[in-house]
Amino acid sequence: MRLFVAVDVDDSIREKVKPILKELSGVSGVKAVEPENLHITLLFLGEVGEEKLARIEERLSEVTFQPFKISFEGVGAFPNPGSPRVVWIGVKEEGELTRLANSVYEKLKKLGFRRDKDFKAHLTVGRVKRKNPEVADIVRKYSSESFGEMEVRDFRLKQSILTPKGPIYKDLRVFE
């Protein structure tokens, strides 16, 4: 099973993000993220055998944190707006989200999981399959937009089920 650890976004944030999702959906070569799939990935685990699931859950239950606020501001692209592969909304935080991601990683590192890159807080809103100059226009248009604030009260172990129509994400366990 394909697993990752994430923070889901509140419905209020989903609503505020819908206009950019709609615009991205209208751009050739871009796949916008479905509103119900919006999340902040703390750690991607990849393909994991079911026999490891209990140990992953046990380690994640050891992660402790207090609820904290994050805000969503600005739009950018990885690696850059001129050659975008991923379109994202920035996540402003005071370090708590990064500490949570690092704590998740430290617990799961003991089970052999590795990061492919350092954690950079962001909310993916689209994936670019084919280069299209319209993407840079959208990034510019929303570059200083504010999408609201939410409180992080939990994180989730999620399964990603890949289908021809796009991924389906299923919560396996919620950690508070």
From Swiss-Prot:
What InterPro entries does the annotation carry? Cyclic_Pdiesterase (IPR009097), Phosphoesterase_HXTX (IPR014051), RNA_CPDase (IPR004175)
Motif HXTX 2 per record, residues: 122-125
Domain of life (superkingdom): Archaea
Per the Swiss-Prot or TrEMBL record, what residue ranges does the short sequence motif HXTX 1 cover? 39-42
Query: By its UniProt entry, which SUPFAM superfamilies does this protein fall under?
Result: LigT-like
Q: Which reaction does it catalyse?
A: a 3'-end 2',3'-cyclophospho-ribonucleotide-RNA + H2O = a 3'-end 2'-phospho-ribonucleotide-RNA + H(+)
| GO molecular-function terms, A-Z | 2',3'-cyclic-nucleotide 3'-phosphodiesterase activity; RNA 2',3'-cyclic 3'-phosphodiesterase activity
Which residues are responsible for catalysis? 39, 122
List residues traversing the bilayer: none
**HAMAP family reported in the protein's UniProt record:** RNA_CPDase (MF_01940)
The free-text function statement in the UniProt record for this protein reads: Hydrolyzes RNA 2',3'-cyclic phosphodiester to an RNA 2'-phosphomonoester.
Query: Would you tell me the protein name for this molecule?
Result: RNA 2',3'-cyclic phosphodiesterase
Q: Which organism is it from?
A: Archaeoglobus fulgidus (strain ATCC 49558 / DSM 4304 / JCM 9628 / NBRC 100126 / VC-16)
